[in-house]
Each structure stands twice: as structure tokens, then as C-alpha cells.
Regions:
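Short alpha-helical transmembrane segments in multi-pass integral membrane proteins
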Residues: 1-25, 79-145, 189-244, 301-369, ...
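Hydrophobic transmembrane alpha-helices of multi-pass small-molecule transporters
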Residues: 63-66, 110, 177-182, 207-211, ...
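Small-residue-rich hydrophobic transmembrane alpha-helices
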Residues: 51-111, 147-166, 275-339, 373-395
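Helix-terminus/linker motif at the lipid-water interface of multi-pass membrane proteins
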Residues: 30, 34-52, 121-127, 183-190, ...
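Interfacial/gating helices of multi-pass transporter permease domains
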Residues: 43-62, 128-132, 192, 235-242, ...
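Transmembrane helical elements of multi-pass membrane transporters/channels
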Residues: 20-39, 139, 173, 202-206, ...
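Short runs within selected transmembrane alpha-helices of multi-pass transporters and secretion channels
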Residues: 72, 139-158, 166-177, 195-210, ...
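Residue-level hotspots within pore-lining transmembrane alpha-helices
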Residues: 31, 35, 64-68, 108, ...
Length: 454
């Protein structure tokens, strides 16, 4: 199979490959997170209770997206390693196998989430806003496949260097959702349920575009034919060796969000949860460039690892970290300078005006959270690219779960610092964990280079 221009780009200079893959990913991720933020702005007009309900459902929804992301990361890593070792036949087979794997996983996950939704919301402490949470969550989880498949299949396009197809459907989906939100929430008077329906319609369009390219237009680098198809359990194992830990990372973040929600509920009630929901969505937008750059390292590092070119692994990782830090500093400055204006976006109605002062205060020090993410994310995604899914997961677990929960509990509850103490805990836990991640990837790459030289 002859390499096309996309493949030539991602198998060449690692710095150019990172930039080629990263910038479109950043744009698409920013659009998606902006869409989520706008979703919150529209729902904020309904009052703090619906907004808090989204805060309770969001961690569960992130699990769905995380499952798709996990499969996509596993496929991306496996295909990239095959490409690096110049085994194009196996790379194509892995792409086809991933299409079927995504469908199988989606069906299983849908059944599980429909069953556990109500009891899980009770356990999370959503009793005060339970009906709102069900109205928003039930449609999303009944149609889980719509959420999982586009994210999973985007990993295939990233692995073949076709970043346009990996990101364009997501951008279209995000823009469409921004248009549909006010129509379904207010014009059709569907309230919080309308927000869920708008999300599903926009993501379904995204999925249709991807399937059109794969099975109707048929002009992708990899060819999707199921003639003589047999499930390759060895490939499924390879995909899931990275995919399960990567998906568990998203699950871990959801669990942390649930735990932090409970801590906020204890120290500040529903209004604190509503504020945290907004703040985390703002932070998510701020770190998206860093995450986009780190995501590109899965492909570039995977190709270098498959080719046993360990020097390129170091170059790609260091360059990704440098770009991530630059973007983190810029977004942090924007938050500091425009904190009052950003907070005002969430206080345009009498129902939601109470959360604005707290948001404005928090935005002035969240740079302490945003900047360290570059270290932790780059390390985790580089390990995924090399097929070290467990290592990536363990680094994420200590950074985003163990340390964050410990410090938020100690500062927020044990030391009675309240809501501000919880935010301090988020910052400290993330900073320490990110430093550990950076240390681990530096040691690992140094050992690879030493082994190669010897």
C-alpha cells in the first residue's frame, strides 16, 4: 500500500508531524468545549437547579465519551505502530477490526448505563435535582452508541494522518449544537431535555458524516471491506491494552468529578456544585490546546516506537510539552485579565447571578491548575503511543484521583477551609501529580536511548 501525502507527513519530521496533527485537533476540541460551555450558559438561564443537574450527569457522560476515546486511542496506537514498522496490511486490518469493536462495546455500554442511571444519580447526591438530572441524562444514555462511535472512529483517521476527517465532523457537530440549543431549550420549551436532544442530533450528524466517508464515498486511506471478515482477538487485545486504560482514565476523571461534587455539596450545597460545573468547563476549554497537542503525540510517538526510532520519541515529547506550555500560559492570562467579563456570561439572569462573584475569584488563580497539565498530559499520551496503557493509567490515577481527592478532602473538610479549600486542593493535587508524570516519561525515554546506544 503506497503512502499518501498524509502518511508521508506523519512519518517524517516529528515536530512537523506534531504540528500537523495538533492544530486541527485543538480547533475541534475548543469548538466542542465552547459548545459545552454555551450549553451551560443556555441552561443557566433555567436556574441553578438545572445547571447543577448537568453537573451531576456530566461525569457519567464523560465516561461514555471516554470509552470512545479509549477505543480511538487504542486503535491510533496500534495502527501507528504498524505504520512505523511498515506493515500496511496489518494497519488496514486493525482499522477494519476497530469498526466492529466500537459497535460491540457501544451495545454493551448502552445496556449497562440505562440500568444504572437512576441509582447512580442517587449515590452521587443528586436528590435535590433528581428529576432534572433524569430528564437530561436518560436520552443521552439510551443513545450511547451515537456518542461513542464518532470519537472511536476519529482515532482511525488520526492514525492515517487524515486530520481533516478526524476533526471536521466534530466541528460541524459542535456548531450545529450551538444553533439547536436555544431552539430546543426555549423555542420548543423543552427545557433541560431539549439540551440533551440537541446534543444527540448534532452528534448523530457527526457519525453519519464519518460513515459516509468510510462506506459510501470510500476514498479513505484504509479500505473498509468485510468480505471474509473474522474477529481478530489478538488485535482486540492490543487495542484494548491501550483502550481500556485510556477509557479508565476518563472513568477516573468522572469518579473524581463525582467525589469532588460530593465534597462541594457538603461544604457549599447546590450553588457550590453549580459553580464548580461552570469553572471546570472553563478550565476544560483552557487546557484543550494542551490536550490536543498531547493527543497528537499518540500517533507520532507510536510511529517512532514502531520504527524503533527512540530519538524521535524524545523530540516529539519535548516539542509537545513546549507547545503545551505556551498555550497554557496564554489561556491563563486570558482568564486572569477577563475574569469579571467571563463570570458575567453566567449571571445574565436573576436565577444565576449568585454564582458570578465566586467564578470571578476562582479564575484569578486557576492558572496554577492549567499550566501543570502540560506536563502530566504529555507524559500520559506519550506512554499510550508506545502501547504502555497501564503506565499511562497509573500516572493519571495518581494525578487526577488519589492526590486531588486527598487534598480537596483535607483542605475543604478536614481543615474547614470550605469551598476555597476544595479549589486549593484541586490545584495542589494536580501540580504534584503532573510533576511525577514528567519525571516518569523523562526516565523512560532516557532508558530507551541508553538501551539503543548500547
Amino acid at each position: 500500500m503506497e503512502l499518501n501525502n498524509n502518511m508521508k507527513d506523519i512519518t517524517g519530521d516529528p515536530k512537523k508531524a506534531v504540528k500537523k496533527l495538533a492544530y486541527p485537533i485543538i480547533i475541534s476540541m475548543l469548538l466542542i468545549m465552547s459548545n459545552n460551555l454555551i450549553d451551560s450558559i443556555w441552561v443557566a438561564g433555567l436556574g441553578p437547579e438545572p445547571l447543577a443537574a448537568i453537573g451531576f450527569v456530566t461525569p457519567l457522560f464523560l465516561i461514555l465519551a471516554g470509552i470512545g476515546t479509549g477505543i480511538g486511542a487504542g486503535v491510533n496506537s496500534l495502527i501507528s505502530r504498524y505504520v512505523g514498522s511498515k506493515n500496511q496490511t496489518k494497519a488496514n486490518e486493525a482499522a477494519v477490526q476497530s469498526v466492529v469493536l466500537g459497535i460491540i462495546v457501544s451495545i454493551i455500554v448502552t445496556v449497562i448505563f440505562v440500568v444504572i442511571l437512576e441509582p447512580t444519580l442517587y449515590i452521587m447526591g443528586a436528590k435535590e435535582v433528581f428529576n432534572y438530572a433524569i430528564d437530561y441524562g436518560r436520552p443521552l444514555f439510551i443513545f450511547s452508541m451515537v456518542t461513542i462511535l464518532p470519537v472511536a472512529y476519529a482515532g482511525i483517521f488520526r492514525a492515517e494522518g487524515d486530520i481533516k476527517r478526524a476533526t471536521l465532523p466534530m466541528c460541524i457537530s459542535a456548531i450545529l449544537n450551538m444553533i439547536l440549543d436555544p431552539i430546543f431549550i426555549y423555542t420548543l420549551n423543552l427545557g433541560i431535555t431539549g439540551a440533551a436532544i440537541a446534543t444527540l442530533i448534532s452528534i448523530f450528524i457527526e457519525l453519519l458524516i464519518i460513515l459516509y466517508w468510510m462506506f459510501i464515498k470510500k476514498d479513505t486511506y484504509f479500505k473498509y471491506t468485510f468480505k471474509n471478515f473474522k474477529i481478530n482477538w489478538g488485535m482486540y487485545k492490543e487495542i484494548l491494552n491501550v483502550g481500556i486504560p485510556a477509557g479508565l482514565e476518563e472513568l477516573l476523571m468522572a469518579v473524581v468529578a463525582i467525589a469532588v461534587n460530593l465534597i462541594f455539596e457538603i461544604v457549599g450545597g447546590t450553588s457550590a456544585v453549580a459553580t464548580y460545573t461552570i469553572v471546570m468547563r472553563l478550565i476544560s476549554i483552557a487546557i484543550m490546546p494542551t490536550i490536543g497537542i498531547a493527543t497528537s503525540t499518540i500517533t507520532v510517538v507510536g510511529i517512532a516506537y514502531g520504527a524503533r526510532n527512540f530519538k524521535n520519541i524524545k523530540i516529539a515529547t519535548r516539542y509537545s510539552l513546549k507547545l503545551g506550555l505556551i498555550f497554557s500560559i496564554v489561556t491563563s492570562l486570558i482568564f486572569i485579565v477577563f475574569s469579571n467579563q467571563i463570570a458575567f456570561l453566567f449571571s445574565y439572569s436573576a436565577n444565576s447571578s449568585s454564582v458570578a462573584p465566586t467564578i470571578s475569584y476562582i479564575l484569578n488563580f486557576v492558572w496554577l491548575f492549567i499550566i501543570p497539565v502540560a506536563f502530566g498530559a504529555t507524559a500520559s499520551y506519550a506512554f499510550q503511543g508506545m502501547g504502555k496503557g497501564i503506565t499511562s493509567f497509573l500516572l493519571t490515577m495518581q494525578r487526577e484521583a488519589i492526590l486531588v481527592i486527598i487534598f480537596t478532602f483535607i483542605l475543604g473538610i478536614s481543615l474547614s477551609l470550605g469551598v476555597r479549600g476544595v479549589y486549593y486542593g484541586l490545584v495542589i493535587g494536580n501540580a504534584i501529580g503532573s510533576a511525577v508524570g514528567l519525571l516518569c516519561i523523562e526516565i523512560f525515554i532516557s532508558r530507551l536511548l541508553k538501551k539503543a546506544n548500547s
